[in-house]
Amino acid sequence: MKSTLALRPVFHRLEPRIRAHVLLCWLALLLLSLALRPLLPVDETRYLAVAWEMWWRGDFLLPWLNGEPYSHKPPLLFWLIHALWALFGVSELAARLLPVVFSLLSLWGAARLAQRLWPQQAAGIGVLVPWLLLGGVFWNNFFSLLQFDLLLVLAALLAWHGLLTARHKPLGGWPLVALGIGFGILAKGPVILVPVLPALLLAPWWAGSAPAPGWPRWYLGGLLALVGGAAMAL
C-alpha cells in the first residue's frame, strides 16, 4: 500500500506523457494495419458486401447478400458503415475507419472502468490498462478488423459503466445498462448477456456494499434494464 501511495505522484506527473505514447503506439499499429493488410476473407469481405448491397438497394432495415436476406448478423455495424459512407462517400477506407474508432473508444472505456473500480489507484491504473490491451494478442488481433467484436466490447463497457453508476444513482445507471444491452443485441445478438448478466447478478460479491436502494430494487432495476435493452433492439 505504501509503495502504491509513493508511486501516485510519479504517475500524476507522467500521465500526460504516457497517454501520448499510448496514442502514438495505437496510431502506428493502425497505420501499419491499414497500409499492409487488405480486407480479409471471409468475414470482412462478406460484411462489406452486405453493407454495399444494402446501400445499392436503398434498404437500410434488412441486410442483404447476393440477392437474399442476410439474417446471420444484426444490422448495427452495417448502419454505421452507411453513416460513414453518407459523410465521406462510398469507399473501403471509410468503412475501415469504424474499427479505428471502436479500438480507441475501447482503450478509453476500459481505462475509465478500471479507475472507477479501483479509485485509490486511479492515477496509475488509468495509464496502465491501455498498455495491457495494446500488448495483448486478442486485442491486437481484432482492433483493426471490420467485424462485430469491438462493437460488442463497447456495448459491454457501456453496460458495465451503467452498473457502477446504478449503485448510487439508479436513475442514471440503469438507462446506461439498457443502452449497452440494446446496442449489444443490435451488434451481435443476445451474446451481450454473457459479459453483462454475470456482473449484474453477482453484484453482491464485487460491489463491496449494498446499493443505495437495496438489493431487491437492484435486481428489479436490472430486470427492467434487460427488458428495455431487448425492446430497444426489436
Predicted feature residues:
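Membrane-integral, polyisoprenol-dependent glycosyltransferases
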Residues: 2-234
